[in-house]
Amino acid sequence: MPNDQTPILTAACVGLLLFASSSFAESPMNVDDAGTLGQGGMKIEGTWRKEGQARGAEFVFGFSPLENLEVGISVARDRDHADSPATRFSAVGAGLKWVPIQNDTGWSFGTTLDFGRTRVTDDATPSRHIEHEIAINGLATWRAEAGHTVHLNLGATRLKTSGQSDTVGTWGAGYEHPLAENLKLTAEIFGEKHSRPDKAIGLRYEVIKGVKISGAIGRGNHRSFGQLGLAWEF
């Protein structure tokens, strides 16, 4: 791939993180679980995140029209202050999550399919371009009777912009540990082919039934990142 395309594909990766990385994953985790909302259930989630010098917010609406199936729609806005003036990212995404095997204890298995579109505006140049992303992910979750949970993800993401395209393999592993009745510790490691992994640790607290607040911090690939989230399931 020519060197002059590297910044474009790097920008695509940032846009992908904002539009879809957490559309189905329960905050504050990036690694997804093999589970869906109950049929007829809905959720609204808002997340503020920081990654290096980029800051942004993501809003997600999810619902389950059928048993074992969840639909997600997301909108994200981000500014990368590594440049002056900042580069702006505006993203929208939609996805499907199907988990045909779901168990309260033991193994559950499923898959997700996400589509995204990111508009990148560089006011310093100025230049504008559109990026398109398609991601597929295999999910496996082990739930223990004591509440400990392990999540495994394996998939691939295809990025296309300015006539160039690239496909990268992705992976992730996450763990949830109950600290109290309504409080969980989360830990995860995730990444993509040809890059070093990212690692994060966080907390999720259920304030009242269906309403959760969360936060996480992490580091990897020579930058730190973090997020704060609020979710309502009903």
Predicted regions located by residue number:
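Bacterial N-terminal signal peptides that target proteins for export
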Residues: 1-12
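Hydrophobic helical h-region of N-terminal Sec-dependent signal peptides
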Residues: 12-18
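N-terminal signal peptide c-region/cleavage motif recognized by signal peptidases
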Residues: 20-22
